[in-house]
Amino acid sequence: MRPTILTFNLNENRLSKLRFLCMKLGLAVKAVPTEDFCQPISALCGMTEPVEAAPAEGFPEELLIFCHMDNAAVNRFLQTAKQMRYAPVALKAILTPTNAEWTPAQLCRELKDERAAVMRGETTHEE
């Protein structure tokens, strides 16, 4: 599958700049419309078929999900974004077997909870 970045809640200007950045790196960008927020992330990145689902809760935060990308590709993206002075997106995740079954809102909540725990100096998962 082609390396893809799923985007959520980016305004048109931010999305346009991100598309340019990703074009330089050979990455696809998929802006996920709010009506698809009910889908599992696996369906949004093309791993599974879409499901019949009730409308999902939205969220206002910007979110990026790196799909079908290894750590080196994610790091290249982050370095290039910094070099191009692309304003950071606070919430980012790499697709995993666990989060693939979540909706974007579930992932957003988890990322915000993890971020808050780190700010408090706590660990977020059992070791």
Predicted regions and their residues:
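N-terminal, charge-rich interaction modules
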Residues: 1-47, 122-125
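Short, structured motif recognition centered on aromatic/hydrophobic residues
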Residues: 4-7, 22, 59-67, 77
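Helix-rich interaction surfaces within compact, conserved domain-sized segments
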Residues: 5, 14-20, 30, 74, ...
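Short beta-alpha junction loops
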Residues: 11, 36-37, 70, 96-100
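Generic detector of short, locally flexible boundary/turn motifs and exposed helical patches
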Residues: 26-33, 55-59, 86-90
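Short, intrinsically disordered low-complexity segments
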Residues: 37-65
